[in-house]
């Protein structure tokens, strides 16, 4: 989808100011003391693939309805997605009824969700999965449904009562940056006060960047992950723009990420229509390097075996979920090549080499292994395994060695480097 328009509406300012004042004075209220998202969250989210399709009469298989989510839940279990780590089934915008109920609570659209969110959550939980839901900090959601402004506490409690496990909180329709920040903080505190473990996914910095640089130290205190840049769409142009933005701003955003709080470059669009195979490999590899939340947005009923195998690749997922929790970064670029690297636990490193050229055939790229992993990854030597586009063992490399790879246009080679000193210690143990 296009970047959701953060249209500014008057009317929330005074009430938000009051809500902010009373919430900060509550004794013992602590922001995001929830112990969640110790590794990047994984799951499925409807937006990029299904958007805001409300026409269940003409398109019953792709409209936003309980049927869609129940079918996805079934497939997440039966087709190995849950076992691979994808545990959150997440509803995005357009699930709500046009108005709140008589007691001011959000309610699901009665035609598309006739049994309500609580029963859907029960079904999802019965599958061993967790349920995510969507709301907005302002007067309306980005699609025009009721927003949470003025209702932060009641909405947080409603989600907890329903058994929701994750909240994606968008940033449309609020009237100032100050009120935007107050709203995100208030909802974080409100979720904590419910006593239920609810992952808090924010879009706070996304709506700040056009006007001022976000304070990521503060954002991390309130959010489990946060969107920074424009919404992804099913195109190579979109993937490139996200990587370019991330590398340009990496000095500001990389170090703040870690267990409990992650930069979110948006959904995985692997298995859809717009990316070539090599471009899908690039997205999977770089989302692992960036320690990104892995939220697929695709149709699990109609996904190719190749895309499924890529999304369920246990070695790549292990890099994404590495317990050290350090986000990777771009090491170098030039001649249409980029090298990204990420430190891993056990003195290991992940390295991704991208061929950004969009013409011609595969190109060779050679790099000194001494330049990788801050000079220590292969000191005195390392064992290198290629994980993508196909897995193969490349063998031992000394610190003085040079590594040569052939990379397809718009494709990526993903490597794992294991220091031989650490490998010897493992063997001894």
Swiss-Prot record:
Which PROSITE patterns did the record assign? ALPHA_GALACTOSIDASE
Instruction: Cite the CDD domains for this sequence.
Output: GH27
Residues binding substrate: 203-207
Q: Impact of altering residue 164 to L?
A: In FD; uncertain significance; decreased enzyme activity
Activity regulation: the record says:
Galactosylgalactosylglucosylceramidase activity is stimulated by saposin B and ammonium chloride.
Effect listed in the UniProt record for changing residue 42 to T: In FD; loss of enzyme activity
What does the UniProt record report as the effect of altering residue 313 to N in this chain?
A: Does not affect enzyme activity
Where is this protein chiefly located?
A: other
Q: What is the effect of changing residue 358 to K?
A: In FD; loss of enzyme activity
| Oligomeric form and interacting partners | Homodimer.
Summarizing the function annotation, the protein's role is:
Catalyzes the hydrolysis of glycosphingolipids and participates in their degradation in the lysosome.
Q: What is this protein called?
A: Alpha-galactosidase A
Origin organism of this chain? Homo sapiens
């Amino acid at each position: 989808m296009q970047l959701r328009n953060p249209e500014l509406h008057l009317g929330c300012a005074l009430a938000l100011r009051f809500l902010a004042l009373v919430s900060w004075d509550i004794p013992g209220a602590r922001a995001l003391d929830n112990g969640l998202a110790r590794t990047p969250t994984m799951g499925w989210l409807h937006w990029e693939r299904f958007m805001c399709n409300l026409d269940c009469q003409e398109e019953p298989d792709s409209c936003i309805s309980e049927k869609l989510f129940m079918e996805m839940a079934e497939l997440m279990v039966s087709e190995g997605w849950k076992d691979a780590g994808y545990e959150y089934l997440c509803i995005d915008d357009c699930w709500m009824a046009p108005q709140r109920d008589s007691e001011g609570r959000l309610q699901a659209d009665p035609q598309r969700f006739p049994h309500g969110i609580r029963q859907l959550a029960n079904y999802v939980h019965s599958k061993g999965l967790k349920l995510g839901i969507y709301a907005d900090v302002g007067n309306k959601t980005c699609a025009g449904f009721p927003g949470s402004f003025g209702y932060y506490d009641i909405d947080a409690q409603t989600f907890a009562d329903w058994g929701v496990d994750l909240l994606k909180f968008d940033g449309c329709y609020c009237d100032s940056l100050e009120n935007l920040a107050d709203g995100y903080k208030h909802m974080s505190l409100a979720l904590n006060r419910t006593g239920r473990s609810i992952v808090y996914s924010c879009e706070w910095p996304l709506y700040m960047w056009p006007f001022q640089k976000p304070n990521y130290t503060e954002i991390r205190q309130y959010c489990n992950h946060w969107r920074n840049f424009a919404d992804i769409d099913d195109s190579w142009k979109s993937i490139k723009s996200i990587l370019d933005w991330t590398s340009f701003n990496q000095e500001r955003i990389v170090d703040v990420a870690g267990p409990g709080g992650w930069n979110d470059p948006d959904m995985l669009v692997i298995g859809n229509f717009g990316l070539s195979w090599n471009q899908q490999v690039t997205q999977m590899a770089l989302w692992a390097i960036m320690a990104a939340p892995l939220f697929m947005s695709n149709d699990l009923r109609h996904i190719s075996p190749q895309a499924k195998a890529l999304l369920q690749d246990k070695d790549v997922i292990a890099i994404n979920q590495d317990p050290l929790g350090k986000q990777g970064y771009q090491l170098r670029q030039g001649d249409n090549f980029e090298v990204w690297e990420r430190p891993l636990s056990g003195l290991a490193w992940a390295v991704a080499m991208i061929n950004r050229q969009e013409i011609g055939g595969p190109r060779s790229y050679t790099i000194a292994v001494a330049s990788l992993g801050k000079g220590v990854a292969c000191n005195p030597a390392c064992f290198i395994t290629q994980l993508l586009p196909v897995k193969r063992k490349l063998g031992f490399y000394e610190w003085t060695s040079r590594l040569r790879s052939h990379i397809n246009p718009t494709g990526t080679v993903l490597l794992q480097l294991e220091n031989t000193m650490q490998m010897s210690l493992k063997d001894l143990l």
